[in-house]
């Protein structure tokens, strides 16, 4: 079975780097390109059409909605399945994105594991043109509270962990898991590290080394 080809588009380079690392770690996914503005998205789509496009709503030059309009005009075949990302849950924008072909609309911050699940779902379900009709703005996904995500980011920055190193992503996941289940602190090497390793398709020892 061939891997799901994913194109990432977001103007936050740090976020894109984390997203690329996580998706690339999935056994059935491959990141074929990244774009930091709307024009780059259109150019990359002209060169190669991905199975799934992860598209941020707010970007320079062309915003996410303008990119969706461009995609419609390009008449790509096959059409990529599109997951929209945004930090704002405005209903009118959500409706417009769905009308223009978005299959899912996800609010930041979100759990990357859930995003991976959504990618698999839209690939294995009906074509996007049919699937979009069942998507409603009210179903916008908010996985984690913004305050929690902001607090975790602040903590990691205070510790001095650079965002580009591999341990950064593992550390974020560890803090989130412990926040949701403090008892994990009593079984860090036996449960916490192995659970993180499963999510990133690596080993517990690798997770431990990267965090340390």
From Swiss-Prot:
GO biological process terms on file: detection of stimulus; phosphorelay signal transduction system; regulation of sporulation resulting in formation of a cellular spore; sporulation resulting in formation of a cellular spore
Cofactor(s) required for function per UniProt: Ca(2+)
Keyword Calcium carried by entry: yes
Post-translational modification: Phosphorylated by KinA and KinB.
A UniProt-annotated Pfam family: Response_reg
Keyword hit for Chaperone: no
CC per GO annotation: cytoplasm
Keyword terms: Activator, Calcium, Cytoplasm, DNA-binding, Metal-binding, Phosphoprotein, Repressor, Sporulation, Transcription, Transcription regulation, Two-component regulatory system
CDD domains: REC_Spo0A (cd17561)
Subcellular location: Cytoplasm
Record function comment: May play the central regulatory role in sporulation. It may be an element of the effector pathway responsible for the activation of sporulation genes in response to nutritional stress. Spo0A may act in concert with Spo0H (a sigma factor) to control the expression of some genes that are critical to the sporulation process. Repressor of abrB, activator of the spoIIa operon. Binds the DNA sequence 5'-TGNCGAA-3' (0A box).
NCBIfam families: spore_0_A (TIGR02875)
Protein name per UniProt: Stage 0 sporulation protein A
Gene: spo0A
């Amino acid at each position: 079975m061939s891997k799901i080809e994913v194109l990432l588009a977001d103007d936050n380079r740090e976020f894109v780097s984390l997203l690329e690392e996580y998706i690339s770690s999935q056994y059935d996914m491959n990141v074929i390109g990244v774009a930091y503005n709307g024009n780059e998205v259109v150019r990359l789509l002209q060169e190669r059409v991905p199975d799934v496009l992860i598209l941020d709503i707010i970007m320079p030059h062309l915003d996410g909605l303008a990119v969706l309009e461009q995609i419609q005009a390009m008449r790509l075949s096959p059409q990529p399945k599109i997951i929209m990302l945004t930090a704002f849950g405005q209903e009118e924008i959500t409706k417009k994105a769905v009308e223009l072909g978005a299959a899912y609309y996800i609010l930041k911050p979100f759990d990357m594991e859930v995003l991976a699940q959504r990618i698999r779902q839209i690939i294995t379900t009906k074509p996007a043109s049919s699937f979009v009709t069942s998507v409603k703005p009210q179903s916008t996904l908010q996985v984690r509270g913004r305050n929690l995500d902001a607090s975790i980011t602040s903590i990691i920055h205070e510790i001095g962990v650079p965002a580009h190193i591999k341990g950064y992503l593992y550390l974020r996941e560890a803090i989130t898991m412990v926040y949701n289940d403090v008892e994990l602190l009593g079984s860090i090497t036996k449960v916490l590290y192995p659970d993180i390793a499963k999510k990133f398709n690596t080993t517990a020892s690798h997770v431990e080394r990267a965090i340390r």
